[in-house]
Design a protein with these regions (language model features):
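Acidic, PIN/NYN-like endoribonuclease modules and their adjacent C-terminal/linker elements
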Residues: 1-30, 36-39, 43, 66-122
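Acidic, metal-binding active-site segment of PIN/NYN-like and related structure-specific nucleases
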Residues: 42, 48-69
Length: 122
């Protein structure tokens, strides 16, 4: 497992990813560690994910990227962030899953430390 879907991303997206690619390395935050980080604040969650080597995937463009950048500037860093752009509807699980699976097949071997990517890519 390498990717963690945050609470803003539906479990339906996770299921759609797994239908496209049965071994896709994603888990929903509610299913990871018994859901104990579902309500964690972004800086706390990013720090925990860094310890576990998990890249967060979500829609929280406004605060997640800001907090990730702050952790990087402070020297603490993060394990990586993938955010969907505004053009991707939160209800379009098919588009989300296709974008994520296609992107991950290309990006899985990248150095993800302190990296933030947006889907679709420009």
């Amino acid at each position: 497992m390498r990717l963690l879907a945050d609470s803003h991303l539906s479990r339906r997206c996770v299921q759609a990813c797994l239908r496209l690619q049965p071994q896709f390395p994603i888990v929903h935050i509610a299913d990871w560690l018994d859901g104990r980080h579902c309500i964690s604040k972004d800086p706390v969650l990013l720090s925990v994910l860094r310890e576990h080597g998990l890249i967060i995937v979500g829609f929280d463009r406004r605060t997640m990227a800001m907090h990730a950048g702050e952790l990087t500037k402070a020297g603490a860093g993060h394990a990586g962030v993938i955010l969907f752009r505004r053009s991707v509807s939160q209800m379009d699980y098919g588009k989300q899953s296709r974008l994520l699976v296609e992107f991950w097949n290309e990006a899985k071997d990248w150095d993800w430390a302190d990296r933030i990517e947006y889907l679709p890519r420009s």
